[in-house]
Each structure stands twice: as C-alpha cells, then as structure tokens.
C-alpha cells in the first residue's frame, strides 16, 4: 500500500528569533504534536544529529529523510539569526488524513493566522506525492516536488488537494469532511 508524502514551505516576514514570531514559535510544537497524534499520520522528518542550532535546519541531518534542503526559490538566510523559511516533510496513510489534519484544530488556527507571520509568495507552498510503503522521502525529494508543481502545476508527480491523483496516477477527487472545525 502506498503512502502520501507531503511537504510544506513558507517564508517568515522576519527571521525566527524576531519578537513578531513569538506566537508562531510558541505554536509550532503544538502543531507538530497534533500532527503526530492525527489519524493516518505515519511519520515526519525530525533531525537525528546533535547540532546545537536553535532555529535553522540548514546543515541538519535528518537520517533517512536526508540532509535538510530548501527549494531553489528560497533566497533567505541560512543561519539562526537570518533563517526565515518554515518547512515540513511528512508521511500519511492517505490524502484524506493529511487534509483532515491540515484543515482542523490547531493547524487550521495557524493557517488562519498565516498572514501575521508569513510573506506572500508567488510559488506553490505545498506538494503531495505517492511513495511505496516503506519508502521515506528526502528533503531533496521535497524540494524537487515543490519546484516541479510550481513550474508545471499538479500532475501525478506532485499535486495538491484541489487537483489530486491516486497512487496509480489517475485523477482523484478528495473526499473532504463536511465542515472543518477549529478548536483554537
């Protein structure tokens, strides 16, 4: 059975340590915790090294997920005091599971407040793709998929919720919940 690989990317208005990011930085561990307890969650990229950076992922080793990378359209800083990118990479049992997580509870609260923290980018900021069960996507894969969907639009290689594809590459209509709810 295939799994859905899912990556997100955004750019903060200010580097991580800026006081305007305090509410985002406080929310981040709650958002990650909620993902890990969501139905359909399989795994997410977490660093395995002991590098003592507070904010940046650049230079970090994520084990089988690979060394951290950002898509080529990111031109921001790469040090703790200059890094402005926010990115995730995760695996899910199916597309409905990641959609349900993304548009409910604490993550929906974060989405609704994204303009407070993030700059508007002309690029696609998330991508999904299917991987065989047991395959772990890498940060390099994530960057390639983000760049691909940005250049070519949704295809079986990289797609979004609006134009999804099943594991066989056929167009797929996402079965969405009736009404997302936010508890925050």
Describe these PLM feature segments.
Residues 1-85, 97-100, 124-184:
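Short S/T/G/P-rich N-terminal loop/turn motif that feeds into the first structured element of a domain
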Residues 41, 98, 108, 117-120:
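Generic macromolecular interface patches on structured domains
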Residues 93-95, 104:
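Beta-hairpin (beta-strand-turn-beta-strand) motif
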Residues 101-113:
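"Short basic amphipathic alpha-helical interaction patches in structured regions
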Residues 112-128:
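Aromatic sugar-binding interfaces of carbohydrate-active proteins
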């Amino acid at each position: 059975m295939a799994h859905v690989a899912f990556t997100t990317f955004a750019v903060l208005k200010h580097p991580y340590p800026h006081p305007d990011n305090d509410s985002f930085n406080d929310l981040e561990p709650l958002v990650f915790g909620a993902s890990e307890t969501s139905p359909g969650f399989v795994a997410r990229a977490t660093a395995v090294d002991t590098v003592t950076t507070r904010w940046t992922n650049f230079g970090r080793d994520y084990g089988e997920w690979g060394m951290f990378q950002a898509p080529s359209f990111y031109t921001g800083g790469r040090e703790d005091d200059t890094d402005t990118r926010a990115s995730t990479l995760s695996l899910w049992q199916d597309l409905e599971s990641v959609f349900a997580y993304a548009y409910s509870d604490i993550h929906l609260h974060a989405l609704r407040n994204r303009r407070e923290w993030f700059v508007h980018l002309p690029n696609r900021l998330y991508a999904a793709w299917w991987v065989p069960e047991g395959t772990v996507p890498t940060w390099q894969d994530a960057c390639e998929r983000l760049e691909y969907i940005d250049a070519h639009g949704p295809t079986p290689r990289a797609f979004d919720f609006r134009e999804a594809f099943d594991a066989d590459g056929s167009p797929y209509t996402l079965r969405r919940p009736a009404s997302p709810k936010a508890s925050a």
